[in-house]
Amino acid sequence: MEFALGQAAARPNAPMSLAQPIGLEALPTPALVLERGAMERNMRKMADHLQRSDKGFRPHSKTHKCPTIAALQMDMGAAGVCAAKISEAAIMLAAGIPSVLITSPIATFAKARALNALLAQYPEHQLLMVIDSDQGLAALQNALDAESRLGLLV
């Protein structure tokens, strides 16, 4: 258990190989545990199907919340990833994911200012978000700097 905890603490977002099985009680949680080969085969199968159907895709990262998996999805042709919240988008951007769509609309000035800070921190990335109200639009208009670039989906 100490080995697993030490690895997780030293590199909390890095893959950790479990070459030797460990008991569930020794597994640092929360943990995403999967068989990578099976995951990659499933991802490739879906990407190939969408390509044959002439469809693009932007998977939602809320199912895995893992930048490593998001990068694999990008490598397989994803246009980017979706994130539910600004904080989740920040993790993906920090990991180098070039395009993130925030799927939960914001309606407060404070959230819009947090979004503005994220836009300033990652100007080379594409950040998109959904908007569903005049209140949300007003919050963005009042909070974003003139040089901020944000794609909106209505």
Named regions from a protein language model:
Residues 30-32, 53-56, 72-75:
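A short, structure-level motif marking secondary-structure boundaries and short turns
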Residues 15-19, 38-69, 82:
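N-terminal glycine-rich anion-binding loops that anchor highly charged ligand groups
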Residues 34-37, 128:
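Short, surface-exposed alpha-helical recognition segments that flank or form part
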Residues 60-154:
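Active-site-proximal beta-alpha core segment in soluble small-molecule metabolic enzymes
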Residues 5, 20-24, 49, 79, ...:
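Bulky hydrophobic/aromatic packing residues
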Residues 15-34:
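Generic N-terminal amphipathic, Lys/Arg-enriched alpha-helix
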Residues 2-21:
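Acidic, low-complexity proline/glycine-rich segments
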